[in-house]
């Protein structure tokens, strides 16, 4: 249940069939300053890893893989595609882009493009469902859905007879701007191929290793 597609003004083109979430760019919700040339970013995932796509105006789409801090967001349905974001939580003079994806806070470079892919780094892990976030009065504000009364499709055998909470719990979380660097371990896992047929000489999509000791 998911797809990345683009519209050329006349028809839709399917770019990739995976769960995708955020589609944005350096301009965020306000739009890119130079929409004809600025990159477009897209985040998604499959069972192997987080997927990060970038669209260049001339080269088209390129894709990269990042490890997952958690598999709790792997559901093959639409609910987990609502939340992760890339937002500028810095200032106009000092932009600071924060990405949330699969339980990890990521430092995301404003300059990320098909020709300049350096700078993505894990910051810390979290155990929340973060809907969106922004900077406010030198604080970070997160809109969180920490637990849901509805279990949706979470009826796996491993869960046993554990029921959902008596009521949903959603609220705003006000915290310091450096909090994304101070939470859980950045331990993560991922792969480029799992049970795939790989041809001789075939090159995988690039996988992020930088940022871990």
Please tell me what each predicted stretch does.
Residues 16-39, 65-94, 123-137:
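Repeated scaffold domains used in trafficking and secretory/extracellular systems
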Residues 2-8, 46-63, 101-111, 148-183:
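Structural motif
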Residues 83-86, 202-207:
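Short secondary-structure capping micro-motifs at structural edges
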Residues 97-146:
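Ankyrin-repeat and related helical/solenoid repeat scaffolds used for protein-protein interactions
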Residues 211-212:
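Extended extracellular/luminal ectodomain segments enriched in beta-structured repeat modules
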């Amino acid at each position: 249940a998911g797809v990345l597609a683009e519209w050329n003004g006349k028809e839709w083109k399917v770019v990739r069939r995976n769960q995708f979430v955020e589609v944005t760019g350096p301009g965020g919700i306000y739009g890119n300053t130079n929409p004809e040339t600025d990159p477009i970013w897209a985040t998604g995932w499959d069972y192997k890893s987080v997927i990060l796509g970038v669209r260049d105006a001339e080269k088209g789409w390129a894709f990269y893989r990042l490890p997952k801090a958690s598999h709790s967001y792997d559901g093959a349905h639409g609910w987990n595609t609502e939340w992760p974001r890339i937002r500028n939580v810095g200032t106009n003079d000092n932009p600071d882009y924060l990405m949330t994806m699969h339980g990890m806070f990521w430092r995301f470079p404003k300059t990320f493009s098909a020709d300049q892919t350096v700078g993505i780094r894990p910051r810390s892990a979290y155990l929340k469902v973060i809907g969106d976030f922004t900077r406010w009065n030198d604080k970070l504000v997160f809109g969180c859905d920490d637990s849901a009364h509805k279990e949706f499709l979470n009826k796996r055998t491993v869960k046993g007879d554990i029921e959902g909470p008596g009521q949903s719990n959603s609220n705003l979380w006000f915290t310091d701007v450096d909090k994304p660097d101070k939470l859980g371990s950045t331990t993560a896992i991922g792969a480029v191929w799992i049970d795939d047929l790989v041809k001789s000489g075939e090159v995988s999509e690039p996988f992020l290793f930088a940022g871990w000791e």
